[in-house]
């Protein structure tokens, strides 16, 4: 039955245009026999531009199809696969834990609040906070009352605390212990910060 359903889906690709069909065409090149090909019919197809963010509650099925993104997760002891993978899929566990709640794609996007060189992204849970910081030659202070992870999204960043100094290039990160806040930063580019608002 799976093969027949996939054959019917693939035959529809010839006569359908736009989304979700464009995404189904894309993923069928990599996973031609995967049940996950039906996912774009059930889920929102969201294209994020640089600097945009979205929030998904736990138990929400999602996939990253192309490009580069920074994912921040709350503390969790599991990841359940739903498709688009050669790995084992525990269907009974998946069905028991996934919540399907209809929502327009634009309601998934978070609208940042700009405060000087910082973009603060409101998160509707207490597990973490997220912000982006645009850097310049002007020294700025980054502080929080919790530990933090600083990730260099683009450009370069120099962090220092007292006599300690650290250079970050794109893709590199630093862990800042709660007792090390605040730190001073400058550079050219952008830092992402994940922390807790206490």
Segments the model singles out, each with a brief description of its role:
Residues 1-16, 27, 48-50, 58, ...:
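Non-heme Fe(II) oxygenase catalytic core, chiefly the N-lobe of the double-stranded beta-helix
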Residues 1-16, 86-106, 130-132:
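Transition-metal
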Residues 43-55, 60-65, 70, 133, ...:
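Short acidic-glycine-tyrosine-enriched beta hairpin
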Residues 67-120:
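C-terminal, non-catalytic macromolecule-binding modules
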Residues 114-117, 126-144:
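Conserved short histidine dyad/triad with adjacent acidic residue
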């Amino acid at each position: 039955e799976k093969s027949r359903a996939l054959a019917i889906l693939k035959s529809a690709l010839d006569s359908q245009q736009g989304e979700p069909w464009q995404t189904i065409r894309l993923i069928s090149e990599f996973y031609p026999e995967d049940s996950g090909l039906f996912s774009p019919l059930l889920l929102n197809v969201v294209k994020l531009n640089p600097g945009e963010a979205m929030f998904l509650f736990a138990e929400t099925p999602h996939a990253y199809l192309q490009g580069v993104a920074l994912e921040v997760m709350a503390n969790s002891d599991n990841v359940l696969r739903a498709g688009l993978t050669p790995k084992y899929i525990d269907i009974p566990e998946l069905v028991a834990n996934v919540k399907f709640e209809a929502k327009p794609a634009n309601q998934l996007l978070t609208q940042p609040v700009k405060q000087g060189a910082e973009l603060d992204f409101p998160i509707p849970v207490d597990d973490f906070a997220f912000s982006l910081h645009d850097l310049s030659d002007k020294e700025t202070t980054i502080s929080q009352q919790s530990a933090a992870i600083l990730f260099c999204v683009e450009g370069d960043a120099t962090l220092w605390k007292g006599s300690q100094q650290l250079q970050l290039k794109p893709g590199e990160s630093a862990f800042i212990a709660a007792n090390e806040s605040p730190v001073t930063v400058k550079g050219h580019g952008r830092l992402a910060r994940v922390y807790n608002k206490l």
